[in-house]
Every structure is written in structure tokens, then in C-alpha cells.
A protein has these predicted regions:
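Boundary/entry segment of secreted carbohydrate-active catalytic domains
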Residues: 21-54
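Substrate-binding cleft and catalytic face of glycoside hydrolase catalytic domains
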Residues: 44-228
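Conserved, mostly hydrophobic/aromatic
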Residues: 49, 126, 142, 164, ...
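Substrate-binding surface in catalytic domains of secreted glycosidases
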Residues: 205, 209, 214-250, 279-292, ...
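Aromatic/acidic polysaccharide-binding cleft in carbohydrate-active enzymes
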Residues: 266-348, 360-365
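Carbohydrate-binding surface patches
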Residues: 363-413
């Protein structure tokens, strides 16, 4: 086992650029749900939820009467969905997804023709009924479509967005308006180009939040499969670069806007499911990560995003049916039963929910060490440490998990406890050796939480 010693001094801490106060983790961590989302079970993991709310559930076509909360397929959004979620103290974000009115419908352009007035009324009715200023108080934000990308005519999307956003403002000005998925790069199949779709002076006042989706997929051409994913810190994925580019654009062009990552995640299915791959997922040798890696990479992603001037991050997805395909096995639960990631995310929320990111203490190829401080007691600190390494989903040597022994010095206070990343119902303390100046413990690719006595 390798041994590494890391020395820190106060000037080294101050060398890292800090940003304005980060959100508490409880106001940062979110999850993507849907009709069958169980708010009681997933309340253990976070308090922010995002729902895919299809417009074609509400009406048969744009222009039809708007009848919230009951829609044309007889779903009652209050009693069947948002009411249940708010009863468990979830703050809900509504993704008004175009569904069958979107680019998958070859006649989508004609569906929206001459519907500018209806778009305004739809946004107004939605905000007035569901928004925080109304009687029901079921949601606090509305996203105007999910992933229209470059397949949806941009001029048409902008028209829909402007009219719907103005309607939302008229219906409830307290509702935060969120863009569709948009990056500060050229548009692709899943995302719009912030610089073209949302930079116009007429658009900027109509939204409050920039919306990102990012997945740790390899750059094109590295593997046969276009879906191969890697660990969050990997150099062969634009996973974090997408966020950095968007933060930079926001700071320069729209500094008053929040940034939410509304989708990120990892698939992990069972060997039994893998044996049943079919179609392109079999031909191109699609593979997910292991259950342990899913837990590791989700926690590390939350920690990384918290350090990047991002206001929220919603993981995808709440549950899966153990399907061997992209997004088919990305749940925290599998057929309703917790995976290791469920316990890991619940632990992060429980342990650091009242903490906010403070600074990066160390970031090397061998160690990431982040500092978090408690909400109203800034002398209560927690360090989170992990090895920023891992395996790609197409690599088979995944049982050789790396472990090293490290010594940290120049501690801010006396170490109280080290919690190992939780992957089952039981939490585990990690063994460590410490004195007033240093602490030694074993480190792996699973983050650990180093809690200190209050600084005197």
C-alpha cells in the first residue's frame, strides 16, 4: 500500500480563489422524479425535486382549453403528483416538456403555428395555479422544455419561450423561469447554444436560471460506444468543462442568473440484466459502471459541482428497472429497492446538509480535499477527501479498487470522527491515528468525511 504525506499551511489555503457564499448542501442537492416517484422514500436523499411535466398530458394540442390541475389523460397534478411531494417538504421544479409536440413529431412546427397567444395563456395559467403566490403553492420554478436541442427550430423555440415566459411572469412573478438545456457551446441534439438562443437583450429578462445537463461520457471517437462513461475527474470527458464554460459565460453576460445542473448521473445494472442487452446496446457493447462506482461518482459529482459556482444539482434518476441501456439503470433504487448510491446520497445529505462549500484545500492527481463549514457555526468544519481516480465503464478491471494511506497536517482543529462513504443501511467510522497536528488514515475512491471539534 502506498503512503503519501500532505502538508498544508494557511497561505496555501488562501491561494485558492473563492467565490461568493455557496448554497447549503440541503439547498443544492436535488433529484429527478416522475409520476411514480415516492416522496417518502426519497426524502432521505434531498428536498429538491424536478418533474417531467409533459404538455401533451395537459392538452391534446396547443390551442386547446387549459384545465389545471386535471389534464386530458385524467392525471390530477395536485393529488397525484405535486401535492404528495410538497406534503413531504419537497420544493418542486416543473419541467414543462413539449413531449409529442416536440421535435420527435415531424409536424411539430405546424402544431405551434399561430399559438403565440395560447403559449402566453398556458404559462400564465400554470404559474397562477401551481406557483408559490397562489393557494396551492405546489412548485417554485418552471422550465420551458427539456432538451429541444438543434433539431427544434431555434426561432420557433425562442417564440414559444418568450410568450410562455411572459405568461409565467404575469401569472406569478415569484416563479423562477428556467431555460431548456443550454450550454455555452454550439448546439447539439440535446442542448441549445446559450450564446445564440438566450443572449438576446429581449430574452435575458425572461429567465432566472441557466439549465445544464452533463454526463461524464468520453469524447467522441475514443471508444466504439458513444455512451461510455468515466469517473467525474477524468481528463477524457467534457463533464466538468461544460459547467466551467457555462459559468464563465454567465459571469460575463448574465451575472444575475443562477446555474442549475438539472441532469447528471451514472447507469449501473446487474450482471443478469447485462446478459440481456439487445439492439445497438449489444452491438456497440454498452456498459454501465458498478453499483459501488455509481455511488462514488455521484457523491464526487455533487462535491465537485458544489465547488463550481453552481446553485443546484439534480441527479438522474430516482428509480430504474435494471435495464441494460443508457438511462435505463441510473436510479438510486432498483425496482424500488435501495442501491449503494441511495445510502451514499442519503448520507451526504444527512451529514453535510447544513454545511456549505468553503474552499479547495488540495487538488492533485492523488488527492482531492474540500472544506465545508456549518450554516450558522462557521467554526464547525468538515473536510471531504477522496482519490480522484476510477475506471471507465468499458474497462473490465474494476475490482482493483485503489487504496492508499495518507497523512494530513496543519489541521484546523482536533479530529472528531471520520465517516466512510455509506453503501448499506449501516454507517461506518473509519479508523485513524491523530495528534494535535496531524491525522493518518486510509483513503480510496470513496469519499470520506473528516469532522472536527469546533475551532476555539
Amino acid at each position: 500500500m502506498a503512503k503519501i504525506k500532505f502538508l498544508f499551511t494557511l497561505p496555501a489555503f488562501l491561494a485558492f480563489q473563492l467565490f461568493s457564499e455557496a448554497p447549503l448542501l440541503r439547498d443544492f442537492m436535488g433529484i429527478n422524479g416522475h409520476f411514480h416517484f415516492d416522496p417518502i422514500q426519497y426524502a432521505q436523499t434531498c428536498k429538491l425535486a424536478r418533474n417531467y411535466h409533459n404538455l401533451n398530458w395537459d392538452v391534446k394540442k396547443p390551442g386547446d382549453p387549459i384545465t389545471f390541475p386535471v389534464c386530458v389523460n385524467k392525471v390530477n397534478w395536485k393529488t397525484h403528483v405535486y401535492g404528495k411531494w410538497t406534503a413531504q417538504n419537497f420544493e418542486n421544479s416543473l419541467c414543462a416538456q413539449f413531449g409529442s409536440f416536440g421535435e420527435s413529431n415531424k409536424d411539430y412546427a405546424s402544431i405551434w403555428r399561430n399559438q403565440e397567444g395560447w403559449c402566453f395563456e398556458y404559462g400564465k395559467a400554470m404559474a397562477r395555479y401551481f406557483g408559490p403566490s397562489g393557494k396551492e403553492k405546489l412548485i417554485t420554478s418552471i422550465e420551458i422544455d427539456n432538451e429541444p436541442g438543434n433539431d427544434f427550430d431555434d426561432a420557433l423555440y425562442q417564440s414559444i419561450f418568450k410568450n410562455m415566459a411572459r405568461g409565467i411572469r404575469a401569472g406569478d412573478p415569484k416563479v423562477k423561469i428556467i431555460t431548456c438545456t443550454a450550454h455555452a457551446t454550439a448546439a447539439d441534439k440535446y442542448s441549445k447554444d446559450l450564446r445564440k438562443t438566450f443572449a438576446d437583450p429581449e430574452m435575458l429578462p425572461l429567465f432566472d436560471v441557466i439549465n445544464l445537463h452533463t454526463y461524464a461520457q468520453l469524447k467522441k471517437g475514443i471508444t466504439q460506444s458513444p455512451w461510455t462513461r468515466t469517473y467525474p475527474e477524468g481528463k477524457d470527458t467534457p463533464y466538468l468543462q461544460v459547467v466551467e464554460d457555462t459559468v464563465r459565460w454567465r459571469d460575463q453576460v448574465a451575472p444575475d442568473k443562477e446555474i442549475w445542473i438539472t441532469e447528471f448521473g451514472y447507469d449501473s445494472c446487474t450482471p443478469k440484466a447485462m446478459a440481456k442487452r439487445s439492439g445497438w446496446f449489444e452491438k456497440l457493447d454498452w456498459r454501465g459502471v458498478t453499483d459501488l462506482q455509481q455511488a462514488q461518482y455521484l457523491i464526487r459529482s455533487f462535491l465537485l459541482f458544489a465547488s463550481m459556482k453552481v446553485d443546484r444539482a439534480y441527479l438522474y434518476f430516482f428509480d430504474d428497472k435494471d435495464e441494460p441501456q443508457v438511462h435505463g439503470s441510473s436510479g438510486l433504487t432498483r425496482n424500488g429497492k435501495p442501491k449503494p448510491s441511495f445510502y451514499a446520497v442519503s448520507q451526504l445529505y444527512r451529514t453535510l446538509g447544513d454545511y456549505r462549500f468553503e474552499r479547495i484545500i488540495k487538488r492533485t492527481e492523488q488527492l482531492y480535499l474540500f472544506e465545508f463549514s456549518k450554516e450558522d457555526k462557521r467554526n464547525h468544519l468538515c473536510w471531504v477527501a477522496w482519490m480522484p481516480t476510477g475506471f471507465r465503464s468499458d474497462q473490465l478491471a474494476q475490482k482493483n479498487h485503489r487504496i492508499t494511506e495518507i497523512t494530513l497536517t496543519d489541521l484546523p482543529a482536533k479530529p472528531k470522527q471520520i465517516l466512510a462513504m455509506q453503501t448499506s443501511e449501516q454507517t461506518q467510522n473509519k479508523d485513524f491515528v491523530s495528534n494535535s497536528k496531524s491525522i493518518t488514515f486510509k483513503l480510496s475512491e470513496s469519499p470520506v468525511y473528516l469532522l472536527f471539534e469546533p475551532i476555539k
